[in-house]
Amino acid sequence: MTDKSIKELALSVGRPVEKLLEQAREAGLPQRTADDIITTEQQDTLVNYLKKVHGQESGNTGKIALKRKTTSTAKVASTSGKAKTINVEVRKKQVFAKPNPEQIAAEAKARAEAEAKARAEQQAREAAEQKARLQTEQKAKATLDAMRAAHQQDSAAQSAPKAAVVVEKRGGGTVKPAPKPAETLEQKKAREAQTAQLKATEEAARRKAAEEAQQRTLEQMRKMASKYSNDDATATIRVIDDSPLASGLVGQAYEDSFNQEDREIKRGGATTNPRAGKKGGRRGQEEQSFVNHNKRGLKSSQANKHGFEKPVKKQVYDVEIGSSIVVADLAQKMAIKVREVIKTLMKMGELVNQNQTIDQDTAALVVEEMGHNPVLVSDTQAEDNLLEAAEEARGEQTTRPPVVTIMGHVDHGKTSLLDRIRRSKVAAGEAGGITQHIGAYHVETDKGIITFLDTPGHAAFTSMRARGAKATDIVVLVVAADDGVMPQTAEAIDHARAAGTPIIVAINKMDKESADPDRVLNELTTKEIVPEEWGGDVPVAKVSAHTGQGIDELLDLILIQSELMELKASAEGAAQGVVIEARVDKGRGAVTSILVQNGTLNIGDLVLAGSSYGRVRAMSDENGKPIKSAGPSIPVEILGLPEAPMAGDEVLVVNDEKKAREVADARADREREKRIERQSAMRLENIMASMGKKDVPTVNVVLRTDVRGTLEALNAALHELSTDEVKVRVISSGVGAITESDVILAESSEAVLLGFNVRADTAARQKSDQDGIDIRYYSIIYELIDDVKDAMSGKLAPEHRETILGVAQVREVFRSSKFGAAAGCMVMEGVIHRNKPIRVLRDDVVIFQGELESLRRYKDVVDEVRAGMECGLAVKGYNDIKPLDKIEVYDVQIVKRSL
């Protein structure tokens, strides 16, 4: 940077001079006018201040941030009791900072000091413990030696008289023991004292050991009790704790020694025969009683009694409730009569019959009111089971190619950029030069395979862009360097953020002279997209689809981002994916574009997509070449489905055709219920609210398109055209050629028949020519929308616009035998016409509205009188004209309105 004026600096960075002066003043710089010179140092100061304001420290922070995303699965228990596999996505962000040598040295020194201090404290503590242990051992040894010496002394004193035995038998004499010396009183007292002391010591040691054992037992029991929250476990622990048997380990062992039969006897229950225990309920007890009576020779009174008895307690059922349920089915599940359920619903304010359907929340309230347990279940249980089985059959996950979606505003060069990458010419063959379908392609580069999804940029294709963001790993946001951020650019940013997808910005059209990438970056910053070169985390590539500039750099950024994300998928097991687009081709049937996300799709697989299922009869890549299999992140087109599924539907390969039919039928039923609900007639409250109001004009439309995505976009765009004065109603819409039934429907409903990228078949053309039905064909979406707007404008009521032509003031009133009151007037402004409507104003208040009966200039009858001239006039049907009244002549023009 060099020294320059504030004006030159503002021009170079593309910012207003006033804004730059304000930022310089906030940064503490002395510049106050546009001609003041700012030095290089002052420019650095300003840049550092702006970085600090926007959340970045000045200078090089020496930090690098890495973002990683890992995907795994976990099994959880579902409401039906079966395990359910869910996807778990963990996103990590690690920031690595360059270490500071001084900081490292200080931390190492502090750590060494802390370790030395801890080591010294540990040594001191060990020495104190060793000393205390030695003292305790010495005291115990001294006590034990004293007790042993006293015991030996007592034993020696008792055995000493017995040892003195005199043998006097010499040749036949008798042997007599020596006489026992008499024990003195002092010796007896000493011996008794030693014995009592020894017993007391042993008793104290035994009592202490028992108390310690009891304390340990109770502590273990309290820990076990804390693990259980039910009252029975707590009560059991409390009983054991309070019982006399809990005085030690013997009590616990005594309690655990009871078997099941002994416990029944101890608690006062009846002892049951082990064999009879196999029979349950009252019937088993009766048979056991009969056996016992027969053993005693007695006759049983219950031998001939019926085995079933009416339950005394009310049965409580677990009632499974889906998203909706019929009233009769709900009553059957609770084993009650339908009228009881209807009574309960009437108390809740719902008037229904037994064949009507109620929602899940209402049904749950009814079940609780009737005293049963509602169990809320999902209507998609069969689908969840299929997905769970498919997940369990998957093999080891490996690295897969990234799926990249190209998004941006219309005419910013998305398809042209993709053509440059693919070395093809797709954009040249598109109607109007704009993309109106999602296109899927995969490109093989030197560093790997990349799958691209090209989305439309027109405002009507919002749902397409949202689907593209959900099915992708990386979003490449294309912004024209000469146009900047536009509405669909901001919308694409919102879709990417909602899907949690990383963004790479590609500034296109860099070869143009009007390219201004700095302005584009400034506008992106306002949308919180901060590029890496400005301290953010969004990679930016400056490219040109026309010259090929920056294409390699863009591909490198995509591959680096995919490596950081660690994208993985399993190539084994049943295939799983998403429908990108679907259409109906004549002679081929439904053609479905699929992006495989997991597993491998093969020819002959049974595919379930939305509410349709079928076997794959043929499969081709995006170029139309036949293939036999497709792995993860590969887009393919398949044939074999009976009808075109909706774009965005999940695709799954199943092994059981019966399960596939059940899931498809359930989805079709749900879709039909939603459609009937949307198209149902107005309810009573809506009819009452609309009474007294005029009928709103309606433009009826029968729509046919080539693909599902375009059909969805056009339906949404046409519904948004409706206003309070005129409505647009799509009578019928579908994918494929216009048929004879469409012409008949358009004739009966007085609808406009529109075809987008489709044509009418022979029967439909003959029928339309015969009945005079006009069929309109379109290939560009905004042309179709403009024509519908014109049709709506024709239904609008015309606007009546008034224009004041002239004003005359009454000067004198005369009486005429022919006209009654005649006024002599002076034309104040404009022109007074004889054949135009007039108003009579008195004190600027309208008192009469009508027309002139006569207009004369002197005695001549004239058609008009200009300003500044006198005239005489008579008002038809009004004679109360007074002087100073004003006669206002006006004209009403009918103006055709438009939207």
Swiss-Prot record:
List the residue ranges of the region (G2). 433-437
Any matching Pfam family: IF2_assoc
Stretch list, region G4? 508-511
Primary localisation category: cytoplasm
Q: Does the keyword Transferase apply?
A: no
Could you tell me where this protein is found in the cell? Cytoplasm
Which molecular function terms from Gene Ontology are attached? GTP binding; GTPase activity; translation initiation factor activity
- Annotated segments matching region G5: 544-546
List every stretch annotated G1. 408-415
Q: Which UniProt keywords apply?
A: Cytoplasm, GTP-binding, Initiation factor, Nucleotide-binding, Protein biosynthesis
The annotated region (G3) lies at 454-457
Detail which positions bind GTP.
408-415, 454-458, 508-511
* Disordered: region residues: 115-137, 170-189, 262-309
Where do the tr-type G domain residues begin and end? 399-568
Q: Which GO terms describe its cellular component?
A: cytosol
State the function annotated in the UniProt record.
One of the essential components for the initiation of protein synthesis. Protects formylmethionyl-tRNA from spontaneous hydrolysis and promotes its binding to the 30S ribosomal subunits. Also involved in the hydrolysis of GTP during the formation of the 70S ribosomal complex.
Q: Which NCBIfam families match?
A: IF-2, small_GTP
Family per similarity comment: Belongs to the TRAFAC class translation factor GTPase superfamily. Classic translation factor GTPase family. IF-2 subfamily.
| Protein name as catalogued | Translation initiation factor IF-2
Supply the source organism for this entry: Acinetobacter baumannii (strain SDF)
The gene for this chain is infB
